[in-house]
UniProtKB/Swiss-Prot annotation:
Native source organism of the sequence: Acanthamoeba polyphaga mimivirus
Highest taxon of the lineage: Viruses
Membrane topology qualifier: Single-pass membrane protein
Descriptive protein name: Uncharacterized protein L310
Keywords: Coiled coil, Membrane, Transmembrane, Transmembrane helix
Basic and acidic residues compositional bias, start-end: 76-91
Annotated localization: Membrane
TM spans (from-to): 46-66
Keyword Membrane appears in the UniProt entry: yes
One GO cellular component, as annotated: membrane
Signal peptide bounds: none
Length: 164
């Protein structure tokens, strides 16, 4: 049996070894130190002395934004009222849109204290879509009209001219 241990000889005194490690060990650097110090300087030089001015400016901006939203809502309401008046004056023969409009108008008068079930913009969107559908295709004058028609073929039949 081999009882010999492989021991390393201690050639350097432990005190000297500690001093060497302290000298050779690189210092721990904080990666974000320049950023932290820069933000710290910016805060102390600019923000801290003017904090009340900054708060005042933020409050003024919030008030201006609130006023802008109110004025915009009032203008939209006026436009909506103008379109309602124009719609009443117009002689539109579209019965579907009139039914929807008058049904909504009557529900407004009956439930004036309640919140509207259908928003005015949604109503205008419905009217727009109905008018768009009606304008998409002209009224049909022929009774036996079917798609696809070949208008350049004699008689306008459903069969393509090249298939005969």
């Amino acid at each position: 049996m081999d009882i010999t241990k492989h021991l390393k000889p201690n050639l350097v005194d432990p005190n000297i070894e500690e001093s060497i490690i302290k000298k050779l060990k690189p210092p721990v650097e904080d990666y974000w130190a320049p950023t932290k110090s820069g933000l710290h300087k910016f805060y102390h030089n600019f923000i801290r002395p003017n904090i009340y001015l900054i708060i005042f400016i933020i409050i003024v901006l919030l008030l201006l934004y609130y006023r802008y939203r109110r004025v915009k809502a009032d203008k939209e309401k006026e436009k909506l009222e103008d379109t309602d008046k124009e719609f009443d004056k117009s002689t539109n023969n579209d019965t579907n849109s009139k039914k929807i409009y008058h049904r909504q108008k009557n529900s407004k008068t009956l439930n004036s204290s309640k919140k509207q079930s259908i928003d005015d913009t949604e109503l205008l969107l419905q009217l727009y879509n109905l008018n768009k559908e009606n304008l998409r295709e002209p009224p049909i004058t022929k009774s036996n009209f079917a798609y696809p028609m070949y208008p350049y073929h004699k008689g306008g039949t459903l069969i393509s001219p090249g298939s005969r």
